[in-house]
Amino acid sequence: MAEYQNIFTRVQVAGPAHMGVPLPEQDSPRTGKKPWQIHLLGRLGMAQIGPIYLGPLGILSIVFGSLAIMIIGFNMLASVGWNPIEFFRQFFWLALEPPSPKYGLKLPPLNDGGWWLMAGLFLTISILLWWVRMYTRARALGMGTHVAWAFAAAIWLYLVLGFIRPVLMGSWSEAVPFGIFPHLDWTAAFSLRYGNLFYNPFHALSIAFLYGATLLFAMHGATILAVSRFGGERELEQIADRGTASERAQLFWRWTMGFNATTESIHRWAWWFAVLCPLCGGIGILLSGTVVDNWYLWAVKHGVAPSYPAVFAPTIDPATLQGVK
């Protein structure tokens, strides 16, 4: 007998394209005349592509974002002598570095960090325009603005890393370079410089909310998949009539841990855990160097960590190795 399994999407319903709700008179038209469907996307979610509403904010966001990506990309290409083969071979190690400490908050020459400043400006404008677009689209649809404010939490962390903290520290060299491995190297050097971020309480909270959000998402996703044979994935119907799917899902968690979330509260829990991850992370980064110079010594002072004897020679301050040389 075949067993019902739905870890991967098995069934696609091919129906007529949905054009969306009517737009207000003052809005620009949607992009794309006729939506189309892609079977592979239907295995992950809705197979329909379009129509897309860009509007002036969306178009400007894409323009500024494209300029930022081009500046970063061409600088990386220039760093390998305009060799496309080396560009792809070394891509994960290439970077566009911030200015060196000697420039402080001044405008440096383009090749000494000026390109980094320009790319960061364009990227920030692009992200903020996209946020405004998300907010206005939610309002136009009569929705709440929960998605926009969740995105704002991520923007907060981005601005702390690349703008707010460098300004408070008085140097653009404190910011993160553009690049995959280089930004990871920056993170490791940052932790070493400020005495191990593991002793930063806001870093600990950020990781707790990160793992918590992952756990909640896994619990919620697994529960809905487990009762989808009873129609549990049709949440609109379940709100009006809990039916056997929601009853079984809630009964399962009451049986296993003595408590169950509701169809609404699980989403509120997940939203808060996900939002608090970058919010706490941004606070922890912002306090490093501005308020606390060494998180390990801070932890020793407050009885969080033991005091270890000095065995090895002091390491070189990573701050002296950052920025464009």
Curated annotation (Swiss-Prot):
Gene Ontology CC entries for this record: plasma membrane; plasma membrane light-harvesting complex
GO molecular function: bacteriochlorophyll binding; electron transporter, transferring electrons within the cyclic electron transport pathway of photosynthesis activity; metal ion binding
Keywords from the named record: Bacteriochlorophyll, Cell inner membrane, Cell membrane, Chlorophyll, Chromophore, Electron transport, Iron, Magnesium, Membrane, Metal-binding, Photosynthesis, Reaction center, Transmembrane, Transmembrane helix, Transport
Chief location: membrane
Sequence positions that bind Fe cation: 220, 235, 267
GO BP: photosynthetic electron transport in photosystem II
Transmembrane parts of this sequence: 54-80, 111-140, 143-168, 198-226, 260-286
Record InterPro entries: Photo_II_D1/D2_sf (IPR036854), Photo_RC_L/M (IPR000484), Photo_RC_L/M_CS (IPR055265), Photo_RC_M (IPR005781)
Subcellular location: Cell inner membrane
Pfam families: Photo_RC
Sequence positions that bind a ubiquinone: 253
Membrane topology note: Multi-pass membrane protein
Binding site for (7R,8Z)-bacteriochlorophyll b: 183, 203
Quaternary structure, from the entry: Reaction center is composed of four bacteriochlorophylls, two bacteriopheophytins, two ubiquinones, one iron, and three highly hydrophobic polypeptide chains (designated L, M, and H).
Family, as annotated: Belongs to the reaction center PufL/M/PsbA/D family.
Function: The reaction center is a membrane-bound complex that mediates the initial photochemical event in the electron transfer process of photosynthesis.
The protein, known as: Reaction center protein M chain
